[in-house]
Design a protein with these regions (language model features):
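Envelope-exposed proteins and targeting segments
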Residues: 23-27, 127-131, 273-274
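Soluble oligomerization/assembly scaffold segments of membrane-associated complexes
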Residues: 75-263
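Short, glycine-rich, amphipathic interfacial segments at transmembrane boundaries or analogous
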Residues: 18-71, 75, 193, 197-213, ...
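Alpha-helical transmembrane spans of integral membrane proteins, capturing the lipid-embedded, hydrophobic core
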Residues: 6-11, 15, 300-304
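C-terminal membrane-anchoring or membrane-association module
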Residues: 310-318
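Short, small-residue-biased leader/transition segments that mark boundaries at the very start
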Residues: 2-3
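Interfacial amphipathic helix/helix-coil modules
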Residues: 257-304
């Protein structure tokens, strides 16, 4: 009877403890890389830069997709200590629990940071990335986890936009240099051609060559014999060249079009989504701690064992 009473007493104490102990509820989310539509304008602009790299042979063969790179940045933010810290600092959940003591508040913040747990996936076992958040109530666990995932995604989008701006500026500088180089080459060829025709025209005038004195096609004549075409033809070629100006190829026209697009600059969307849910956070139906039935059974057994020990000691003393 003693061990039964002891067991019942300990079980009741455990039951009372569960009513006053701080509760812990957890909600879990499972994520994967986003779709093209979720990335919005970021995808098309990043792909535009990649196409420029392909044209200039700067792209690597094993380059990950835009979706993979965006999701990689999201996962980095999701697991980041700084992201978790910044998230809690801006929540009412943390502010309402501050006591005004710097050490106590810092300890509370550390505890909350550890209450967000990122579990990396294992693709060899087809396990996706997941994140769990522990809070004092079921609604808080659900709502805070949704907010945290969105917060991490927004930070990832901000970092990706910064990288896009930097890459865009670098490509603009490269394209300007390339276009300028092509213009200088075309101008040098034009000036050399103009000079050749002008010199040939002077010689033709000096020798009074008024008509063509050769059967060789004009395109096959070396510059030193161009005067044989005669003054009228050379004058016409000179005027035509002056009217047309430097000649540019298709590659130059394409580069000019690309440069015009680059000069406009990227259009940044600060809130594009860098993930998609495979398991959306929900309100948990069972709390993590304290587990009432488990504690009552465990402490009931402990109480029973203590009661049995007390009864055995009394018998031995008699």
């Amino acid at each position: 009877d003693v061990y039964k009473r002891q067991g019942l007493a300990f079980a009741l104490i455990a039951l009372a403890y569960t009513f006053f102990a701080r509760q812990e509820w957890s909600s879990t989310a499972i994520t994967d890389r986003p779709t093209v539509n979720m990335l919005g304008g970021y995808y098309s602009q990043q792909q535009f830069l990649r196409n420029l790299d392909v044209r200039s042979n700067m792209a690597s063969a094993d380059q990950p997709s835009v979706m993979d790179e965006a999701y990689k940045e999201f996962v980095m933010q999701l697991a980041s200590w700084d992201t978790r810290r910044e998230f809690w600092l801006q929540t009412d959940y943390y502010k309402q629990r501050m006591v005004g003591n710097s050490k106590a508040d810092a300890a509370l913040l550390d505890e909350m940071i550890n209450n967000i747990q990122f579990i990396p996936g294992d693709f060899t076992r087809a396990v996706n990335d997941s994140v769990k958040l522990i809070a004092e109530t079921a609604p808080d666990a659900n709502n805070l986890l949704r907010q945290y995932v969105a917060f991490a995604s927004q930070r990832a989008a901000s970092h990706l936009n910064d990288e896009l701006k930097g890459a865009w500026a670098a490509r603009t500088i490269q394209m300007k240099a390339q276009v300028k180089r092509q213009e200088e080459v075309a101008k040098a060829i034009y000036d050399r051609r103009m000079n050749s025709i002008e010199q040939a025209l002077k010689i033709a005038e000096q020798h009074n060559i008024s008509r063509s004195a050769t059967d060789v096609p004009a395109e096959e004549l070396p510059d030193s014999e161009m005067f044989l075409l005669g003054r009228p033809m050379l004058q016409a070629r000179l005027e035509n060249l002056q009217a047309v100006g430097p000649a540019f190829d298709l590659d130059y026209d394409q580069n000019r079009a690309m440069l015009n697009t680059l000069n406009v600059g990227p259009t940044l969307d600060p809130r594009f989504q860098t993930y998609r849910y495979l398991r959306t956070p929900e309100e948990p139906v069972k709390r993590d701690s304290p587990r009432r039935a488990f504690l009552m059974i465990m402490w009931g057994i402990v109480g029973g064992l203590i009661g049995a020990g007390v009864a055995l000691t009394r018998r031995c003393s008699k």
